[in-house]
Regions:
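The feature marks non-catalytic terminal segments
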Residues: 1-13, 26-30, 85-168
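Active-site beta-strand->loop->alpha-helix modules in alpha/beta enzyme cores, enriched
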Residues: 1-85, 153-156
Length: 168
């Protein structure tokens, strides 16, 4: 379950906007302004409530329409006129994003070495059973993607991101 994965990753609080198995099928039909409001202020873990320094969001290059919708809502909620402004905003990649997209190709410009946490990442993902499937959403695909991204930057295993904002 999501709760099991969050526990394994020591995530102390989270909010599922759609918390039943069928709800993610219509997330992209939810008005964008209502998702923006959830992200900005109404969620228990909203930007206003937790004031995160770093936020990672789905990439626009996902072939999942609900992920693209959430990406667009996040970009609007994280605009630089928001209060507070998160210093670091990144789009993350999932293994299947490099295989099929109608909107473009994920081109990362920020890499994080994950040698020490790859097993924990795979174990956490394995708790989210409804999301496991061959061809991008399985342990081998996660490890292979990390190897590929690591090779791009001369490291062993890396996770790749696209930087939207990075303020030091």
């Amino acid at each position: 379950s999501v709760q099991d994965a969050m526990n394994l990753l020591n995530v102390d609080d989270f909010h599922l906007v759609h918390d039943t198995p069928d709800n993610n099928r219509d997330l992209d039909a939810k008005p964008l302004h209502s998702l923006i409001e959830i992200i900005e202020s109404s969620s228990p873990v909203s930007l206003e409530k937790i004031e995160p320094t770093m936020v990672a969001i789905p990439t626009i290059f996902s072939h999942h329409q609900d992920h693209v919708h959430v990406h667009n809502a996040c970009i609007a909620a994280l605009r630089p006129i928001s209060t507070p402004v998160s210093d670091i905003v990144l789009s993350y990649e999932a293994p299947e994003h490099s295989r099929w997209s109608a909107t473009g190709i994920f081109e990362p410009n920020f890499f994080v070495e994950i040698d020490d946490v790859i097993d924990q990442k795979i174990q956490a993902f394995s708790k989210y059973k409804s999301q496991i499937r061959p061809g991008g959403r399985d342990a081998d695909s996660i490890r292979n993607q990390a190897k590929y991204r690591g090779q791009e930057v001369g490291k062993n295993l890396c996770e790749a991101f696209y930087v939207h904002r990075f303020i030091l």
